[in-house]
Each structure stands twice: as C-alpha cells, then as structure tokens.
Regions:
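Bacterial signal peptide processing site
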Residues: 24-27
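Substrate-binding cleft of secreted/luminal carbohydrate-active enzymes
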Residues: 58, 62-77, 353-565
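An active-site-proximal structural segment forming one wall of the substrate-binding cleft
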Residues: 150-186, 207-234, 240-241, 258, ...
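N-terminal carbohydrate-binding/catalytic regions of secreted carbohydrate-active enzymes
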Residues: 64-173, 504, 509-511, 532
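Substrate-binding cleft and catalytic face of glycoside hydrolase catalytic domains
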Residues: 95-99, 114-155, 182-206, 214-225, ...
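C-terminal motif of bacterial Sec signal peptides marking the signal peptidase cleavage site
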Residues: 19-22
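Aromatic-lined carbohydrate-recognition surfaces of secreted/lumenal glycan-active proteins
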Residues: 187, 296-339, 367, 419-435
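Active-site groove signature of glycoside hydrolases
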Residues: 170-206, 234, 251, 262-282, ...
Length: 565
C-alpha cells in the first residue's frame, strides 16, 4: 500500500497486523466473470487480442523482463532530481494526481510520461532496458471500506477509462523509449482487505454495472471527437483553446506538442471530464464487446480485458497482501508451520473470484509485506517504535523464509486455473533499509536512522559479524522489547530476534536469491510510497542510506546476478 503514517497508526492499531490482507475462505466456486447464457449474451471481442496472452518468456519470468532476478525501485520520474546513471531494471510509481486512483476523476497522465522519460534516460545512460511500472487503483480500500468506486457509475466509468488509457499509452509510447512496453500493478490492498475484514458476503452481493461502463469506455477510447471550442477543452494558465480533432490519444499528443507534460495532463483530464464523457454517455451500448457478469468477478475480468485489449504487450499484475486473513500479518512470526494454513485461505479467496483463472488473466501476482522499513527510526515522537510494535514489520531470517514459502505455495496453488506450472511472482514495496552497524553514522541528508533486514537477507553484508554484536546501538534502543504478537521473537530485542536462528547476516552467497528464484520470483521492487528506504533517496518519499543499497545492487549486477529457474 501507499504508506500514510496517520492512516497506518489508526488503522493497524485496530487490525493488529500489516494494513491489509486476504481471505477466510471463498465459499463455493463462482462464475469467472464472463457472462453466460444464463446472465447476458456472449459476444466476440471486436479489437481484442487473443484472450490467452503468452505469459511466459524464454526464461522462467515473463515477457520483456530479464532472465535473471530483476531489481527495481520507487521513483517519481523526475530526471532533474533522481539518479539517472544507476543500473536498474524497473522503476515504479503511483498513477494520477493523488496516487489513490483519483476516485471520481479522470487521472492526469503526466506521471506515465514522466516515468517513460525517466526509464528512457536511465537506459540511455546505462545501456540497459528499464521497465516503467505504474500502480493503478480501480477500487481504493487502503483507507477502509467503501463501495463508491464500483457502485457509482460515474466513478466506475472513469476508473475503467483511466486503466484503458494507461494500458494504451504504455503500449504505444513505452517500447521505443525504454525497450519494454511497461507493467501495470493493479489494485494494491483490495483483495487483501476483503479477506482481512471478512467482506466476502458484502462483495458477493454487489451489483456492478460492468458492461455499460466498458461500452462507454470503448467509445471514449476509440471515437473521434471535435475538440474545437468544446466545453472545458483549454490548456495553460491563459485558457488557450484546444484546436484539434481526433481520439483521446490524438488529444494528449496534441497537448504535449503545445506545453509541458504536467500542463498537458491537466488539460487532458479537464477536457475528457467536461466533454468526452458526456459525448459517450448518450451512445447506445456496444453489444459487440465481450459481456461480463454484473458482479465482482465480472468487474475483475473487465479490467483484465481492458489491459489485454488496449495494451496487449503490457504486463499486468494483481496484488495480494501478507495480512489477508483476520489475524493480519502476524502469522509470519509464528514459524514455518504457519505458512500453509495462511496460503490455503488466500488461495480460496483468489479462486472464488477467478482472479487468475478467468477468461482474461493477468500475467503475474505481486506481494508486499508493508511499505515501511522494519524500524523507521527517522520518524519523530517515537513513531518508529509505535509502527514496529503495531505492524509486525521487524523480520528475521525465518520470517523471510516464511514469506518466500508463501509466495511459492500460492504461485503453484494457482497453476491449474492459470494454465501454467506456476504464476510468476513480483515482490513489491520491499523496504531497502539494512541492518546498520556502529561504524555507520547517522547524518542528516546522508544516512537516516532506518533499520531493515530484507537486503541483508538476500544479499548479505560483510560488515556484519556473525553474532551481530556490532549492530548499531540505536536499533535495540528504538525498537524496544518485541510484544507478544511477535511469536517466536516475543519478548526479545531486535538483535536477539535477528540472531535467534544463528543466520549469517554477513554472508556473500546467493542462497537466498536462489530461494527467491525457486519461489518463482522474477523481480524485487524496493522502496514504497513513504517511510521506507529505496535504491536511491527521494525527498519526502524514501530515506537516504549513504549509497548502501545502490552499491549493493552494483555489486549484484557485476558479480552475482541470479538466474531464474
């Protein structure tokens, strides 16, 4: 999820685990979201590619991603303020103005173009393709239960248009610039929230007018419009009139030729909102489009279809939390026997809604654990300790072993409906803070007081000795004694928890990178929307670490690239 500290402390003090989650069982088998003769007529897609996309590349990953375990980071797509010579395989950001799907609004697309440009610049400087990943919310449940995103028809149409336009833009603009067609990360926290809060009955009762919305979106995406003197169709501060005709894609290209990406995006959103939507609202329904069931399953299928149709070479992933059961994310601290019971509940939820077994399938599943460092010591007023005690964020080696075993079991458990041996896995928003030593000094703007174990687990850090007796003193002081929900680590300090299993955090081998590949992980994207370290520091988004993570990845690319299986 995109982190917000006030939201974190308020919500997770209640749920007692990582913010969102997933299932307590899905009940009986559900329709896969395609309308049948018992619901509404089935039609053949008019412009869609084959319903079964090729989801496997020549490697064990997916198309246009490397044949080794890829690495990525959060970015704002700003070449003026972020490094552009750091080797990286992928960058990600949240689409729209507010990063939450902009409910009820046409999203401004300027971030899409900024990310494509950022990836292009890094590719030019490093010589390697960079995959721009865009997070797209169609239903934002990170902040709690609401149904307006799917039951308010205006919201529904705008969300689906935003997704279709994102897919189309990546399809047509990304490849020449970046060497890939990009990736869409769909609906963080949605499925996890449903399972965590046991909302399946509420979800199953929803009547979502999917077909009318898809028909209107098809009109908005394909019709030609006369934008001359159209209401709301102006650009720049002085409201210059838009003087062009064509599709919405022609509109944004015309605007980009007149002004900067940000101003063009604002003008595009206003024009589509004020004019294009109204032109298509009165159009008769297009019955030549695929027909979907008017429920949650049909809504899922409609999103997959729109990406397949408008971005046939764009990769698509659906998200799952590790807190997808009523107990939240604390299960990960209960030892290896806690994995399979959790997995079984998640698989029940995913199968109930045919997320990976419908006619239109995503390309991969992506997991996060929570968008904050294990101990966010940089937060004021002891908020870092509140976070680590409320959010189950402090991980030792057994916790990461459990995490990878979870991904492997879910990936393989979805195989039958997916039609392949497993569903490829992305690890997303993994915090890049490391276990700091006493030799590392906290300096404002250079190195923040953040602690995390993920990079040390996967890559190791030769600066750490086997007993961790050189761990920075402020880590144990800041974390305090871990509470009873920490299971095997309950009552321990941070360093005691980290050394509980005698794991060598100073290793320099690829054993855990291989374990990730064995769990069908094709990429790890580092950093998050707030309170997490990333590959590089972004003011207000990610913390500085004196170049530790960037140097670690440089060594990985030079000496240790992990092949996929």
């Amino acid at each position: 999820m995109r982190s917000n500290y006030k939201q974190i402390t308020k919500t997770l003090a209640i749920t007692g685990g990582l913010f969102l989650s997933a299932c307590n069982g899905g009940g009986s088998a559900a329709n896969n979201g395609q309308a049948t003769s018992g619901t509404s007529p089935t039609a053949t897609p008019t412009t869609v590619v084959s319903t079964q996309r090729n989801t496997a590349s020549t490697s064990a990953g997916i198309n246009e991603w490397p044949n080794y375990l890829a690495m990525g980071t959060i970015s704002q797509g700003l070449t003026s303020s972020e490094p552009t010579s750091q080797k990286i395989d992928a960058i990600f950001t949240y689409n729209g103005a507010n990063g939450n799907g902009d409910p009820g609004l046409i999203e401004t697309p300027y971030k899409i173009y900024n990310m494509i440009n950022m990836a292009k610049t890094i590719k030019q400087n490093t010589g390697y393709s960079v995959n721009p990943n865009i997070v797209e919310y169609q239903w934002q449940l990170s902040g709690g239960w609401n149904t307006e995103d799917v039951l308010n028809q205006d919201y529904l149409v705008k969300h689906l248009f935003n997704l279709a336009f994102l897919a189309s833009t990546l399809q047509t603009d990304a490849y020449a610039a970046t060497g890939t067609h990009g990736t869409i990360l769909l609906n963080p926290d949605l499925l996890g929230f449903i399972g965590n809060t046991q909302r399946e009955a509420d979800i199953d009762a929803l009547n979502i007018q999917v077909n009318g919305a898809v028909s209107q979106v098809s009109c908005m995406m394909t019709e030609s419009f006369n934008f001359n003197n159209a209401p709301g169709c102006t650009y720049n501060w002085d409201k210059q009139p838009i003087t062009t005709t064509g599709t919405v894609k022609d509109l944004i290209n015309w605007l980009k030729g007149k002004t900067d990406n940000y101003s063009a995006g604002q003008a595009f959103s206003n024009c589509v909102e004020s004019y294009v939507i109204k032109q298509c609202a009165s159009k008769a329904a297009n019955n030549q489009l695929p027909q979907f069931t008017s429920n949650f399953n049909g809504w899922i299928q409609a999103q997959n279809y729109l990406v397949h149709n408008y971005g046939p070479q764009v990769n698509l992933g659906w998200h799952m939390n590790i807190s997808a059961t009523p107990g939240g994310g604390w299960w990960v601290h209960e030892g290896k026997n806690a994995v399979t019971p959790y997995v079984n509940q998640v698989l029940s939820l995913l199968n109930h809604y045919s997320v990976f077994s419908g006619t239109y399938k995503p390309d991969f599943i992506y997991f996060d654990r929570y968008g904050a460092d294990d101990y966010a010591g940089s937060l004021a007023d002891n908020a870092g300790q509140t976070l680590v005690q409320n959010q189950a964020t402090l991980y030792n080696d057994q916790d990461w072993d459990n995490f990878l075993q979870m991904t492997k079991q879910i990936s393989e458990g979805l195989a039958s409906g997916f039609g392949k041996a497993y569903v490829p896995v992305m690890l997303w928003q993994i915090p890049a803070a490391h276990i700091q030593t006493n030799a590392e000094k906290i300096e404002s703007g250079i190195n923040a007081g953040e602690e995390g174990s993920a990079p040390d687990y996967f890559f190791g850090d030769p600066a750490l000795n086997s007993s961790l007796n050189n761990i920075a003193d402020w880590i144990n002081l800041g974390v305090g004694t871990l509470n009873s929900k920490y299971g095997l680590c309950a009552g321990l300090t941070a360093s005691q928890c980290l050394t509980l299993n005698n794991f060598n955090w100073g290793h320099s081998d690829n054993a855990k990178l291989q374990a990730a590949a064995d769990a069908h992980v094709f990429s790890i994207l580092w950093g998050a929307g707030g309170f997490a370290t990333a590959v590089w520091a972004i003011p207000g988004v990610s913390f500085p670490d004196n170049g530790w993570m960037a140097n670690t990845l440089n060594n990985y690319y030079t000496n240790r690239k992990q092949p996929l299986n």
